UniProtKB/Swiss-Prot annotation:
The lineage of its organism: Bacteria, Pseudomonadati, Pseudomonadota, Betaproteobacteria, Nitrosomonadales. PANTHER family: AMINOGLYCOSIDE PHOSPHOTRANSFERASE DOMAIN-CONTAINING PROTEIN, AMINOGLYCOSIDE PHOSPHOTRANSFERASE DOMAIN-CONTAINING PROTEIN-RELATED. This is Homoserine kinase. InterPro entries: Aminoglycoside_PTrfase (IPR002575), Homoserine_kinase_II (IPR005280), Kinase-like_dom_sf (IPR011009), Pseudomonas-type_ThrB (IPR050249). It catalyses: L-homoserine + ATP = O-phospho-L-homoserine + ADP + H(+). Keywords: Amino-acid biosynthesis, ATP-binding, Kinase, Nucleotide-binding, Threonine biosynthesis, Transferase. One of its GO terms (molecular function) is ATP binding. GO terms for biological process: threonine biosynthetic process. It comes from Nitrosospira multiformis (strain ATCC 25196 / NCIMB 11849 / C 71). The gene is thrB. It is an enzyme of class 2 (transferase). Pathway: Amino-acid biosynthesis; L-threonine biosynthesis; L-threonine from L-aspartate: step 4/5. The keyword Lipoprotein does not apply. Its EC number is 2.7.1.39.
Amino acid sequence: MSVFTIVTHEQLSAWLRNYSIGKLVNLQGISSGIENTNYFVTTSHGKYVLTLFEKLTSAELPYYLNLMAYLARHGLPCPSPVADLANKFLGELNGKPASIVTCLPGKSQESPTATHCAEVGELLANMHLSGLSYPEKMENLRGPRWWKAAAQEVMPFLSEDEAAILGEELRFQSSHRTESLPRGVIHADLFRDNVLFKDGAMGGVIDFYFACNDVLLYDLAITANDWCLNENAELDPERTLSLLEAYHRTRPLLEIERDAWPVMLRAGALRFWLSRLQDYHLPRAGELTHVKDPAHFMRILQSHAAARSKLAEVWI
């Protein structure tokens, strides 16, 4: 979440006349994150989050907004999009598609314990099961086809060693097939900053704008790559097992998923290494932006590649 498009108090006050959520009291830009423009919005009725979408189009956005509304109706602790007076979730503000959603309580947990990882595992499994009946479909816009295109864009900026690592990983991933793995709706970005805790309990999960239909295990791998790492970019066995076991109790994992686990961990690291390389070397203009270190995910990828047999041992 960043601020690429400026919204003034007067502009938002006028825009909010299309909604029944009271008068604007306060507007505050959110600098964390990297994809969209986000503001905390306080009105006379409560607190909300305003998002102006910088990349996603009006044709793509109903999938994400309807998904949040669907999951909230099914008991998942996620933001609920607010409909305007015309009963639409999506509007336009300052030339960008825009929506406003409820603001969930809590803060992210930067130093998660095994207990936190277990809560996240259960949450993710419940989301996957609930999503099986979600009728809309969206391909993964950050999937293998995008990996190849993004790699071509960033390759001129890489050192010889970095380019070799990237090329080898693309070859490795292209040699593995995922068609037989369970699929459904995935969050695809369940990092620590997208899960909120309040007074030791989970407050909810946010930022569904990378959600798509893809391999469920890939979602679990992305989550493990952020929640379960130690300072050496290796999976911590205790936290990883807590995540996997809690997930498995709700959606039992298959033997074929165990076999694919090391591949999916590397795929998750590759995807975020590439997106961070893009953001670092090809930045977009913005007033409050947050660019993250791409080398972090290169280290994770290297660690996973060097420990494939060890990764397979950490399983339920």
